[in-house]
């Protein structure tokens, strides 16, 4: 595995306070390291992620940032998992660590897909050939 600079691990932790919800230390570390590696390979900075729109498909008027959207998704996923546990208990158990990690990792590939051009996020050359659902898995 490629060495990850500690700076990017710190950035991932700062972007994702929800990592603390993951109790499994190994899964928390892998989730953090995946984000850190994506940050290390990306042209996008943490500040870019706090300001760029969460999708390129909605047009220039969209004001919801990538990180606001992503963190909301993680909170909604966690709430849904807790509610499933409340209703289904042991009949349909929810692995909350896996649920939270999956929600955090869902769009990590966008860090490789997007580039900044004239202060705006655009789909980069890499993203034209391999979109984020696939690059995020790799």
Question: Where are the predicted features?
Answer:
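Acidic/His-rich, divalent-metal-binding segments that scaffold phosphate/diphosphate chemistry
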Residues: 1-123
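Divalent-cation-assisted or electrostatically stabilized phosphate/pyrophosphate-binding catalytic cores
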Residues: 120-138
């Amino acid at each position: 595995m490629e060495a990850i600079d500690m700076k990017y691990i710190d950035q991932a932790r700062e972007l994702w306070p929800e990592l603390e919800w993951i109790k499994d230390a190994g899964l928390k570390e892998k989730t953090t390291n995946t984000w850190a590696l994506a940050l290390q390979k990306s042209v996008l900075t943490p500040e870019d992620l706090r300001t760029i729109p969460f999708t390129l498909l909605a047009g220039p008027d969209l004001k919801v940032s990538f990180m606001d959207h992503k963190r909301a998704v993680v909170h909604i996923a966690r709430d849904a998992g807790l509610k499933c546990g409340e209703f289904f208990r042991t009949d349909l158990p929810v692995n909350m660590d896996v649920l939270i990690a999956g929600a955090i990792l869902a769009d990590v590939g966008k860090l490789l897909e997007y580039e900044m051009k004239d202060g705006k996020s655009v789909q980069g050359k890499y993203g034209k050939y391999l979109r984020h659902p696939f690059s995020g898995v790799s």
